[in-house]
């Protein structure tokens, strides 16, 4: 297994943060996290999405630009990195959240700013996509008991969940290990975690699927 830069992705509530943290601990790697709770515009976005989505997405963009710098430095040092977000994940959120019509086309403005500011993005050696049903992600958010579930705008979670599926159906920039997140609990089940490690080690080609029934 010769991965230096691993990304764990999945819809909100899929368990990507827990899995990326465990992988980082296992490999003694730098854990790079998106930490949406640090976004000062996020609460305002949840209360009034149409007025605050652009500010929220620009904040995440600046974080991703900083992440590129961190990844490049760590790769130069030959250090391993495990991240809980894909640098291109704005392609999932921006089309849903920002207006794409005149006057004031926010999507166009966002992509123009990104084109000007974003350096060349490093490509992961492996992306682990936790593919979960909407019901499972919803339960995952309920278990967190942090009140976040009640803050999302109506229909937001469903749209994000659908867009994740569409995005990874088309994604070809890096090898993808697609994991059935409905069946596996990597945070609490050591056997499931070992299955994942074996699948990572045996990964061949650009796309592989891991299901509990086939592991």
PLM feature segments, named:
Residues 8:
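Hydrophobic anchor at the beta1->P-loop junction of P-loop NTPases
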Residues 16:
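Conserved lysine of the Walker
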Residues 25-63:
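Conserved substrate/cofactor phosphate-moiety recognition/catalytic segment
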Residues 64-102:
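A basic- and aromatic-enriched beta-loop-alpha substructure that forms the phosphate/nucleotide-
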Residues 90-162:
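A glycine- and Lys/Arg-enriched "phosphate-lid" helix/loop adjacent to the NTP-binding pocket
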Residues 139-215:
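NTP-dependent small-molecule kinase module
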Residues 11:
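P-loop (Walker A) phosphate-binding loop of NTP-binding proteins
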């Amino acid at each position: 297994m010769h991965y230096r830069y691993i990304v764990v992705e999945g819809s909100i509530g899929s368990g990507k943060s827990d899995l990326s943290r465990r992988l980082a601990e296992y490999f003694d790697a730098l854990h790079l996290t998106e930490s949406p709770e640090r976004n000062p515009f996020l609460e305002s976005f949840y209360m009034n999405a149409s007025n605050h989505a652009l500010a929220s997405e620009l904040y995440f963009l600046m974080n991703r630009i900083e992440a590129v710098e961190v990844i490049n430095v760590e790769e130069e040092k030959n250090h391993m990195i495990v991240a809980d977000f894909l640098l291109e994940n704005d392609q999932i959120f921006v089309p849903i959240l920002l207006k794409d019509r005149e006057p004031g086309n926010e999507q166009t403005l966002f992509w123009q700013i990104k084109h000007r500011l974003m350096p060349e993005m490093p490509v992961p050696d492996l992306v682990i996509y936790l593919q979960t049903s909407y019901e499972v992600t919803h339960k995952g958010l309920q278990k967190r008991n942090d009140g976040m579930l009640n803050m999302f705008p109506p229909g937001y979670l469903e749209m994000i969940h659908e867009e994740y599926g569409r995005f990874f159906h088309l994604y070809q920039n890096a090898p993808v290990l697609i994991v059935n997140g409905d069946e596996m609990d990597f945070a609490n089940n050591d056997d499931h975690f070992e299955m994942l490690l074996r699948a990572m080690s045996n990964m061949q080609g650009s796309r592989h699927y891991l299901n509990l029934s086939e592991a």
